[in-house]
Structures are given as structure tokens and as C-alpha cells.
Amino acid sequence: MLGHVRDLWPRRAGGLPPGQGLVDTFPRFGVHFASPLPVVPPEPAIEVRGAVTTPFELPLSALDELPRRTLVADFHCVAGWSVRDRHWEGVAFRALWEESIAPHAQPGITHLVFTGLDGYGSALTIEDALADDVLIADRLDGAPLTGDHGAPARVVSPQQYGYMNTKHLSRLVLHTREPERARHSSGVRAFMLSFVAPHPRARVAHEERHRHLPAWSLRFTYQRIVLPILATRMGPNARSPRPLDDHVT
């Protein structure tokens, strides 16, 4: 089977970052890709905890009071696949931070841990979280987010690999130093993430795939693991991706 699955591996197309290849579809992927979608509460909110004067809840409806932003950006998975020109809509996280969160924050915030309804979390440095292109998005390609892509709202940080883009956002914890378990989950998933040792910055342009290992050493491993899974996620179109250029890196 790997004979034809290997043909699916996206070849490097012009303009993509190091180690990335282009695919046609935008599959649900990640640590939780095979799990049932989380249940969204009738009135979703973001719990704000950690280094704040008083913990509070921020209803997602509060996003309606902030200026809307549209962002067209590529999405890059740490496993090596990319999709181009996704149209995200939402609010700039910087605007949400300055309007609703920073007034309650204690001095010296260095990291923010975003957690979703599915229990997955990612830790961003305050510098990365406040970048101009980081959104809390509720729409993708002209339609409300589906469960596969993070409904009701998710983090979109295009300069970082997908594992920093927490879906189903429901909790934000402020820290004054790097959390010991920056990416937290439970059971088998926690073990998997500790083995993978994700990079704390995960910047695509620097190919920061792993906390300790050089990026090139992971490309073959990720391809061996991800190829069969990607084939099943692409469904009936898996055997006929659109032509890509032949420059492989």
C-alpha cells in the first residue's frame, strides 16, 4: 500500500517554507484528529486564569464588539504539509488582549496557554501571541468554522506551525514564566507530546519543529508516520492531487 501512498506526499512547490509540501485539501489533523468533536456549550466563553488580578470569563459574543479582521494566509503543519491561501475572519488577538485581558493581567506576563474544549493546549510567548497576524478566528473561507476546524473559535498564528493554533478555544492562562507543561493533554496524548518535544516557538520560517533535534532529522520520520494517515484524511481525492512543481526539498 505504501507504494501508492508515497505518491501522495506533497512535493515542494515554489514559495513554501523549508521542508513543506503542498496538498489540495485542508484535513482535520493533529493529536485529536480521530477523536469525537467536543460539545460546544450554548453560550461559549473563554475562561481567563493564571496571573490575573481576578479570574473571569470572556463570552465569545464579546468578539462582536471588536473590529473584524480578514487574513489570507498559508497553513503549515509541523508534519510537513501545507495548504495555501486560507481566508480567516475574526478579531486580532492583540486587540482582544488590549481591550479585555491586559487590564486584568499582573506585571511580567511572558507566556499565554490557549486551551480548547478538546483539552489540547498550546503555549505561546507573549511576543508571538501579540504578532499583528494572530487572530481569534470564527470563520474560514467565507463560512463559520466547522467542528473539524475549531468551532466556535480558534487561534490562528500563521507564522507558527499548526500545533500552536489551538482549536475550540475555551481557556486562556497567563504565566510569568514558561509553563513546565507548555503543551498539555491527558493520558496517551500527554506521553506522545512529551516524546515529540515540540519547539517552544514553532516558527515556520526557522523550521522550529522540535525542541532539541535538528529539523532535517524529523522530515523522514514525519513522512513515514503521516503519509498513511494523510491518505485516509484526503478521502476519494487522495489518488489525484493537483499537479505540483518538481522541486523537492
Where are these regions (language model features)?
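A glycine-rich, hydrophobic loop/mini-helix early in the fold
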Residues: 34-91
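Residue-level marker of positions within ordered structural domains that often coincide
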Residues: 53, 82, 98, 160, ...
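Short N-terminal helix-initiation segments at or just after the protein's N-terminus
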Residues: 16-22, 53-58, 96
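Mid-length scaffold segments of soluble, non-membrane domains
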Residues: 74-122
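Short acidic (Asp/Glu) patches
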Residues: 59-63, 92-98, 137-140
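Extended, aromatic/histidine-rich regions of cofactor-dependent oxidoreductases associated
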Residues: 1-42, 46, 102-249
